Amino acid sequence: MRQFFPVDDLARDERFVQTNMAERMADPRRAQPERSPKSSKSRGATARLTPDRREASDAARGLMHGIMTGEIQALEGAGRTAHDFASGDGTNDTIPFALKLDMARQAWDEARHVEISVKLSDWMGTELGEFPENTVLFSAACSDDPILRLAGVNRALEGLAIDVFTQMKEFGDLAGDPFLEFCEDWMLADEVTHVKMGSDWLRRVTENDPERRAKALEFQQVVDKLFSFGGLRGDTDESPIALARRFRELAGFSDDEVEIISEMDREALAERKEQIRRAREAAGLEPEPA
């Protein structure tokens, strides 16, 4: 069987429309609710994805579609990691056999998540391909170094999944949708184990190779920063997706690691605000109200 499958060769039928990060963030239907016109001191000023938003339906459906395509790629990525590398002690492009088994178990979890997500999307009135598929998750699973895959996929992107599932679980609760709430809670429990597994293996395999560990954690920060674009996720009410600190701690993140992610989210939000300010200034528009 072929090894090291490139992202350009992913098997997709005509229903799927693939996109890049820039195009995705420009999609007006993405889960980035507008701020309420109420006072910034009121609860209505939050940018969190809640059912009372006028664009809540499209935002939630778009986010659910993104979860579904992400689960497909997570399944493909876990399967590739189990197959691409020979069994060994973790050096010279090998991975411990026990890690192969863990990745195979994760692939089974992801297959179940795909089935759940497809049914949830149908439940929410979304057709496959209605929203574009961003293939960055599988791109992170294409590294020649299995430890970079653990850092980029299991810690960074599966970590983001913890934040997203927590937000969607809360959305289902507020919307009075027990199906959405239960399914998101079920998948969230799996994601915590996936991130914890990735964290544990990264530390074990790089225990005697601090340079390799530092490189992996640097790659993780690059991926985290990419998905912090525009402050989509963060601790403040200006971010639609909250940083799920408690679940990240359960998944093996240290307090310092969570703070680093939070700081990157704040920087990304500030960068987006500055981009908006410059764009409005160039267009001759008044600055946005504070």
Task: Please place each PLM-identified region on the residue numbering.
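Non-heme di-metal
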Residues: 1-290
